[in-house]
């Protein structure tokens, strides 16, 4: 197979790891902290996870760090372990380094250890479709993007027959542990599997690894999910390139939609990196109950003011999930989903788009109908055409950036007639998503993911189940990073999914009181009127650490001065 010169060089990159993980794993001890609860719905979750709820936080420490008030558990006698890994959900840069870290950790623990990769995501767990990951295989994928070593998938393990199939697979393969690499839904699956295995007397432990470029799987113990750093650096390069083009041509407004359906972390991080004229934050729209008309008017005011200064160009960042945070649009989508769930067969029986449109207008309430009819035809058609297997609107397929362009164009024409706008408006729409999911991981993600793999190995060695690997102190030097495990139930609450209450890991949305948003909100008025673009350039892998190794702006603002010892949840000495 032919590979690029960069890939050849990246194969040689040796990820930096915390000092704790450099030595003999037999010298690494587990220190249990305080028992945990959940985000909310404690009683319901305690009932559903009777065997794994309330487990303590875990910190891994050197055997020399003795503390009588917080005793340590030494590592068991080394033996060969059989561990499997599955990649679940969408791709994120660094997944192959999680596999590499887990593989290297297992071989360091005992030469007879075996790492197995389930193929095609959770479906591979159900079918037993797998490969053994040997040194040659993993070496060919070190520090590379993508999940193509074993593939990924979006199958959810949720029915009784699926749990039984998973149990049969891990039992037949005599697995000591199953490592699930995924986002909130995938790690929710991991928690359910861990509980099921314990209840069934199956010894296989289940361990999660936090993955999502969206950045919405985090809390005090999980400082960031892997892939966010690389993806936002990749998008920011593209935004910077477009901003430079806009500043050169001086005649286009670029509306750029960015991945992030549930949270606006990607848009916010890219805004902090590139300083666009406008960046919409979905969480702020919801908090202020801003209507579509208000958002459009705000955009038009910025465009008109810049035009007065001869600047008929600009950059607007739009989070992918914005449309679901606009109150009247959220109500419309909710009603559409309910109507389609109840009367899907009636809708599907109609043989023309016009007939479907008339039918849906009659089925909607008066308020929802008014919103639906006010939308541009191409957008309302998308609401009806793009639906998931449950009949729900697929929000990610709605061209929100096009919706804004169409509405802004219409409103600016009205403002011209009113005499409040005298400029020229030309627009271009973009969507950046897949461009960032499989990039070569940044040095930060390469180091972080490799460390996550080593940490998952330690959790398997020490026989923990129902935990997600945690690496902290991420704004310190890598040598000072701290590692451990967080009970998955600690991240959970109950939410309504497809008509019933389900246990799920709660998504971390943009905190409007947090430092990243506060810094953004202080500066955005200036960026709106004064062209202040920053051009980050491509992700750098070689050169000064300030250029190559810096983590995201978000995490640096959230955690500017980590404590020297950030062990969490354990009894103080």
Curated annotation (Swiss-Prot):
Pfam families: PFK (PF00365). Its main location: cytoplasm. The active site is at 214 (proton acceptor). Substrate binds at residues 212-214, 251-252, 259-261, 320, 434-437. The record marks 211 as: Important for catalytic activity. Mg(2+) binds at residue 184. One of its GO terms (cellular component) is cytosol. GO terms for molecular function: 6-phosphofructokinase activity; ATP binding; diphosphate-fructose-6-phosphate 1-phosphotransferase activity; metal ion binding. It catalyses: beta-D-fructose 6-phosphate + diphosphate = beta-D-fructose 1,6-bisphosphate + phosphate + H(+). Keywords: Cytoplasm, Glycolysis, Kinase, Magnesium, Metal-binding, Transferase. Non-allosteric. It is found in: Cytoplasm. Diphosphate binds at residue 90. Its cofactor is Mg(2+). One of its GO terms (biological process) is response to glucose. It is an enzyme of class 2 (transferase). Optimum pH is 8.0 for both the forward and reverse reactions. Pathway: Carbohydrate degradation; glycolysis; D-glyceraldehyde 3-phosphate and glycerone phosphate from D-glucose: step 3/4. Its EC number is 2.7.1.90. The record marks 185 as: Important for catalytic activity and substrate specificity. The keyword Cytoplasm applies. NCBIfam families: PFKA_PPi (TIGR02477), PRK07085.1 (NF005482). Homodimer. Catalyzes the phosphorylation of D-fructose 6-phosphate, the first committing step of glycolysis. Uses inorganic phosphate (PPi) as phosphoryl donor instead of ATP like common ATP-dependent phosphofructokinases (ATP-PFKs), which renders the reaction reversible, and can thus function both in glycolysis and gluconeogenesis. Consistently, PPi-PFK can replace the enzymes of both the forward (ATP-PFK) and reverse (fructose-bisphosphatase (FBPase)) reactions. Belongs to the phosphofructokinase type A (PFKA) family. PPi-dependent PFK group II subfamily. Clade 'Long' sub-subfamily. This is Pyrophosphate--fructose 6-phosphate 1-phosphotransferase. It comes from Treponema pallidum (strain Nichols).
């Amino acid at each position: 197979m032919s590979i690029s010169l960069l890939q050849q060089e990246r194969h040689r990159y040796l990820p930096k790891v915390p000092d704790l993980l450099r030595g003999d794993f037999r010298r690494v001890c587990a220190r249990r902290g305080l028992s945990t609860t959940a985000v909310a719905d404690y009683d319901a979750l305690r009932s559903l996870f009777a065997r794994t709820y309330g487990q303590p936080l875990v910190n891994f420490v050197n055997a020399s760090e003795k503390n009588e008030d917080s005793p340590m558990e030494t590592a068991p006698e080394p033996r060969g372990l059989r561990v499997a890994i599955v990649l679940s959900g969408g791709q994120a840069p660094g997944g192959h380094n999680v596999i590499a870290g887990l593989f290297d950790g297992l071989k360091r623990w005992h030469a007879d250890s075996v790492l197995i990769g389930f193929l095609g995501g959770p479906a591979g767990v159900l079918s037993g479709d797998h490969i053994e990951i040997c040194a040659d295989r993993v070496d060919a994928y070190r520090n590379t993007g993508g999940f193509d070593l074993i593939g990924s998938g979006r199958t959810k393990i949720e029915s009784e027959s699926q749990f039984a199939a998973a149990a049969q697979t891990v039992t037949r393969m005599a697995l000591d542990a199953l490592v699930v690499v995924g986002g909130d839904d995938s790690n929710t699956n991991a928690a359910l599997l861990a509980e099921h295995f314990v209840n069934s007397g199956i010894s296989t432990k289940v361990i999660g690894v936090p993955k999502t470029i969206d950045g919405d799987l985090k809390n005090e113990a999980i400082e960031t999910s892997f892939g966010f750093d690389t993806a936002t650096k990749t998008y920011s390069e593209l935004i910077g390139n477009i901003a430079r083009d806009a500043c050169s041509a001086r005649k286009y407004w670029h509306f750029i939609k960015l991945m992030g359906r549930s949270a606006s972390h990607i848009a916010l991080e890219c805004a902090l990196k590139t300083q666009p004229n406008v960046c919409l934050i979905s969480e702020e729209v919801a908090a202020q109950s801003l209507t579509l008309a208000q958002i459009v008017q705000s955009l038009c005011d910025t465009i008109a003011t810049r035009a007065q200064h001869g600047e008929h160009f600009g950059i607007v960042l739009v989070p992918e999930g914005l449309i679901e945070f606009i109150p009247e649009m959220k109500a419309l989508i909710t009603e559409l989903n309910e109507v389609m769930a109840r009367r899907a067969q009636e809708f599907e029986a109609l043989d023309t788009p016009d007939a479907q449109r008339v039918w849906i207008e009659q089925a909607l309430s008066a308020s929802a109908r008014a919103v639906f009819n006010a939308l541009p035809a191409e957008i309302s058609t998308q609401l009806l055409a793009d639906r998931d297997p449950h009949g729900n609107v697929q929000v990610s397929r709605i061209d929100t950036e096009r919706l804004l362009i169409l509405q802004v164009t219409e409103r600016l024409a009205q403002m011209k007639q009113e005499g409040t706008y005298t400029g020229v408006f030309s627009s271009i729409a973009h969507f950046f998503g897949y461009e960032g999911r499989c990039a070569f991981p940044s040095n930060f993600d390469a180091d972080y993911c490799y460390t996550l793999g080593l940490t998952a190995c330690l959790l398997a060695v020490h026989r923990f189940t129902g935990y997600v690997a945690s690496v902290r102190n991420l704004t310190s030097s890598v040598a000072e990073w701290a590692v451990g495990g967080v009970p998955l139930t600690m991240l959970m609450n109950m939410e309504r999914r497809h008509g019933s209450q389900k246990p799920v890991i709660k998504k971390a949305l943009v905190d409007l009181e947090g430092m990243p948003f506060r810094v953004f909100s202080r500066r955005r008025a200036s960026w709106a009127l004064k062209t202040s673009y920053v051009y980050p350039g491509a992700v750098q892998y070689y050169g000064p650490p300030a250029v190559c190794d810096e983590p995201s702006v978000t995490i640096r603002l959230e955690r500017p001065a980590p404590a020297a010892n950030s062990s969490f949840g354990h009894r103080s000495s």
